[in-house]
Design a protein with these regions (language model features):
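Bacterial carbohydrate/catabolite-sensing allosteric modules
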Residues: 13-24, 39, 45-48, 66-73, ...
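N-terminal winged-helix
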Residues: 1-16
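Short catalytic-loop micro-motif centered on adjacent basic/acidic residues
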Residues: 26-28, 53-54, 109-110
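Short beta->alpha connector loops
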Residues: 31-34, 54-59, 115, 174
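Acidic, Gly/Pro-rich loop/turn segments at junctions of secondary structure
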Residues: 51-61, 76-81
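Structured beta->alpha junctions
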Residues: 2-3, 29, 114, 172
Length: 209
């Protein structure tokens, strides 16, 4: 959804780039729902669009393999035959965890949307903690969670481990901002008492923070 800062900024730049070249852009927000994503795919194919750029985050959706249109994915692999544009998420996860440790964190947690082998930012985080002999603490708030509920769920996850952690690597900047709000509510000074690092580096979040 473009409600998230990263995808909002991505959509803005893609739309501007295409407009300068004479293309109109259809923006489809799947809101993390696989059924809605399938409906949008059917709609775009039926309208014979010139191509599809997808940044959807639904695992196991096989529909993309059967689309005979120019197609590229952003950030997440959709199919072995679909080109993918993304940063080095695993290296980014390592850099984030290493930075927290260098700044004095001893028990950094990971806050992410989904845990598992496909989460390369988590993989990088785990590698660094394993090398340092630190037990990982992974907190999840599902990607599909409505924006109105995310802050509450993040606070609940953090409250459960507040005595066991002294830093958080949040795999998106909006979550990092919500961790900072949680820390302020508990009189934890950043970065003196508690350390937080995000990932996206969006313009909106840099201005907000």
């Amino acid at each position: 959804t473009v409600a998230l800062p990263f995808f909002g900024e991505l959509t803005e730049h893609v739309e501007d780039f295409l407009a300068e070249r004479g293309y109109r852009t259809f923006v489809c927000n799947s809101m993390g729902k696989a059924d809605r994503e399938r409906e949008y795919l059917d709609l775009l194919v039926s309208h014979r669009v010139d191509g599809i750029i997808s940044s959807a985050h639904n695992d196991g959706l096989a529909d993309y393999s059967s689309i005979h249109l120019p197609l590229v994915s952003v950030d997440r692999d959709l199919s072995p035959i679909v080109p993918n544009v993304r940063c080095d998420n695993e290296a980014g996860g390592r850099l984030a965890a290493e930075h927290l440790l260098k700044r004095g964190a001893r028990r950094p947690a990971l806050l992410t949307s989904r845990t598992g082998i496909h989460n390369l930012r988590e993989k990088g985080y785990r590698q660094v903690l394993q090398q340092a002999g630190i037990e990982p603490v992974v907190l999840t708030v599902d990607f599909n969670t409505p924006n109105s509920e995310r802050p509450r769920l993040i606070r609940e996850r953090l409250d459960l481990v507040v005595d066991d952690i002294d830093a958080v690597f949040a795999t998106d900047d909006l979550a990092a901002a919500q961790v900072m709000e949680w820390a302020a509510e508990r009189d934890l000074r950043i970065p003196d008492d508690f350390k937080v690092i995000g990932f996206d580096g969006t313009v909106a979040m840099r201005h907000a923070l």
